[in-house]
Amino acid sequence: PPTPTNTPVPPTPTNTPTPTATPTPRPMSLRDDLPAMSLADWPRPAGDNGWGMHFVIDSYPSEEEIDRNIQRMLDMRMKWAVVLYGDEIQLQKLAPRFRDSGIMVIWRKMLRPYEAYYDWGRDIQILKDLGVVPYMQIYNEPSVAQEWPEGQSNQAVFLENLVAATEAVYNAGGYVGLQFVSENWLIDALNLIKQREGEAVFQRMFFIPHSYGMNHPPSYTEDINAVLSFRIFALIFQEQIGFIPPMIVGEGGWKWGATDDGRYPMVNDDLHRDYYVELYSWFRTGMLSNGEPLPDYLFAFCPWLIAHKMDDNAFYDSFAGDRVITIEAIKAIPEFTRRFSWE
């Protein structure tokens, strides 16, 4: 991710020449009948192994594409997924299929950070009516220039959209999923929720880190370009709100052929296999690659990406070929159920 700067983006000039006093922001309007949740209270899939995958990037996939890729995930014993949807019709098409497959989904409405969305409540209700757990990611990589028109990010615009979305998802009984790749933008968002008296949200909020490893080994911790980089965000939550919410890594892992850091070898077929087997084994052994215990807050890791013709991160269908030996090695890991400290 780009290094965030402290230079604010100038607002679009208006025709009002006289400056006005900044109004006191209104407090968030949150229902008061939802219980706070501890880590043990959060829904998880039956036979949970912490293994996941980001689903296809087309937010309007065909039924054939949906079914083919769910089957691939089932063949690899995946229990979690991040799934994009374009509209409520797609949600109604996708949700029952994942429900019936036993895969727990983090739903992500296809939105840019500058786009307000007014149907969070409807979408949460669709999921509830279908018997689907309403894990809902709100926006995606808002600090990244490519998400904005002409690459000009505007944090103030995004934060207003975030507050409105957080309020709507929370009040509908959904689980509020925050996603940031910028540490500063996360801190600013948490502070704004506190300023708006929205702390109740923190007790029903989860975080979706993006933990890409470049060509760094699984144990790498020198900087944020690591599959272990979710630990950096855990420290921020601990400092800012006093605890660490559930985390489901929603993108990340290794790109086949990656050579970003000259100190480390290219991610060839063998390393791709070895790195992913090690990553997914965290949930089996209870130990991270750096020797730390697997934290209870890390619910799942969903690497980028199950399938895409134009993306050499993809496990299937890529121009770079299918990641056959990685897929077979993952399938060969003995079946297990992930254990938490409270069990």
Predicted segments, located by residue:
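Aromatic-rich peripheral "rim/lid" segments of glycoside hydrolase catalytic domains that contact
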Residues: 31-45, 52-63, 261-271, 275, ...
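Substrate-binding cleft of extracellular glycoside hydrolase catalytic domains
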Residues: 86, 93-185
